[in-house]
């Protein structure tokens, strides 16, 4: 049975992932058996009404829908935020659309035959988390002690941490000390990303900043989602578009037709360095569509050709040789007057690859880390202890 929830946070407090972690511990204490890691599902990055973390969570437990619903509802009525809870065995296929489009909450609610409670707007995210499959990446979140909330985070690691990241990559990825600790007021202390939970737990043991009281391992779509290609696009959508042609550098940004790669992504220098060259590119653009802007979130399968014609040098004095007309190969040295048939020099450069914004600037969803399923076949996370660690002496009830 799936227990899914969304929007249990507030602008300056609370966190849906923390609420879900505590709910999982609560349900286990009531005798319900946990069946897998909690799921953390990042949602549409284009909508302006998203929550701070822009994610919903789903838990999988063994038990009757009615009993799980009543127990979870009673627990969540005391939680921060005004979110939604959904409990059922089957969820409507709304996951891709909830990540890429704007959905009508009333229409989504009609498709769900299970039990639910809360706001319809939050129900969309909860149902998306409940329906999500194929989540082979993980995020390990650790939470601050309540008495430290509102104070600056103390985020530091043992020197061995960076050595572990280098050795374990890509089983641990995008978790450098500079980006693991968020800057906002939420209770998350740090987040380690990867695809191998045992190595990620080991990395957490090398954290020597402020103490944390709880840590949870989530399955997630983070760093692995590729939006679908569509001919049409509408405001507040996350979509992939194909572009062929020449890009243009305008100010600090780079334009691919109507789509803008903003300087803040940290990757515009790839194209700015080629100013003075003519260019032809073929690329798939992941685009966040908003009113007045279509921002590029990633460049996939980029193929770029750059070329520049250079005037040949005079073989006698080394001066520049200029053309004597369009219908002739004759050139004349501007310095000494020497004439000869000389072909212009053509400098060509080629770039191929997939490019994402730098760490700390990319969307949660963006990345190319698609790993084999974990745990290995025949093993699942059947108790909170394999996914949730609670510091000694803290009563979670």
Curated annotation (Swiss-Prot):
It comes from the Archaea. It is found in: Cytoplasm. Keywords: ATP-binding, Cytoplasm, Ligase, Nucleotide-binding, tRNA processing. One of its GO terms (molecular function) is ligase activity, forming carbon-nitrogen bonds. GO terms for biological process: tRNA wobble cytosine modification. Gene3D superfamilies: 2.40.50.1010, 3.30.70.2200, 3.90.600.20. The keyword ATP-binding applies. Its EC number is 6.3.4.22. The keyword S-adenosyl-L-methionine does not apply. GO terms for cellular component: cytoplasm. ATP-dependent agmatine transferase that catalyzes the formation of 2-agmatinylcytidine (agm2C) at the wobble position (C34) of tRNA(Ile2), converting the codon specificity from AUG to AUA. This is tRNA(Ile2) 2-agmatinylcytidine synthetase TiaS. The gene is tiaS.
């Amino acid at each position: 049975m799936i227990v899914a929830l969304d929007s249990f946070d507030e602008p300056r407090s609370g966190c849906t992932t923390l609420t879900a972690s505590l709910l999982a511990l609560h349900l286990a204490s009531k005798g319900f058996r946990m069946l897998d890691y909690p799921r953390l599902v990042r949602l549409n990055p284009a909508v302006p009404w998203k929550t701070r973390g822009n994610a919903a969570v789903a838990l999988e437990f063994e038990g009757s829908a009615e009993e799980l619903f009543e127990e979870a509802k009673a627990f969540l009525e005391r939680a921060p935020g005004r979110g939604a809870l959904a409990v059922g065995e089957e969820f409507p296929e709304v996951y891709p659309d909830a990540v890429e489009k704007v959905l009508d909450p009333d229409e989504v609610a009609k498709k769900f035959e299970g039990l639910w409670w809360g706001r319809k707007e939050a129900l969309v995210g909860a149902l998306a988390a409940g329906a999500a499959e194929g989540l082979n990446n993980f995020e390990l979140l650790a939470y601050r002690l309540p008495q430290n909330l509102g104070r600056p985070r103390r985020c530091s690691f043992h020197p061995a941490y960076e050595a572990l990241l280098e050795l374990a990559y890509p089983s641990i990825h995008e978790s450098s000390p500079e980006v693991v600790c968020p800057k906002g007021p939420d209770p998350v202390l740090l987040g380690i990303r990867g695809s191998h939970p045992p190595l990620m737990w080991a990395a957490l043991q090398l954290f020597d900043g402020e103490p944390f009281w709880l840590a949870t391992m989530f399955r997630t779509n983070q760093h692995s989602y590729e939006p679908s290609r569509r001919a049409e696009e509408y405001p507040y959508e996350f979509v992939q578009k194909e572009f062929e042609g020449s890009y243009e550098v305008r100010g600090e940004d780079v334009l691919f037709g109507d789509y803008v790669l903003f300087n803040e992504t940290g990757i515009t220098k790839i194209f700015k360095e080629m100013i003075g060259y003519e260019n032809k590119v073929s690329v798939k653009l992941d685009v966040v569509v908003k009113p007045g802007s279509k921002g590029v979130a990633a460049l996939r399968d980029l193929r770029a050709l750059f070329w520049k014609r250079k005037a040949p040098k005079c073989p006698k004095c080394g001066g520049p040789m200029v053309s004597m007309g369009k219908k002739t190969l004759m050139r004349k040295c501007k310095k000494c007057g020497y004439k000869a048939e000389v072909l212009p020099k053509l400098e060509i450069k080629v770039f191929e690859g997939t490019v994402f914004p730098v760490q700390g600037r990319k969307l949660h969803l963006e990345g190319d880390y698609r790993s084999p399923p974990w745990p290995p076949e025949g093993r699942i996370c059947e108790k909170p202890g394999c996914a949730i660690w609670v510091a000694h002496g803290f009563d979670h009830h």
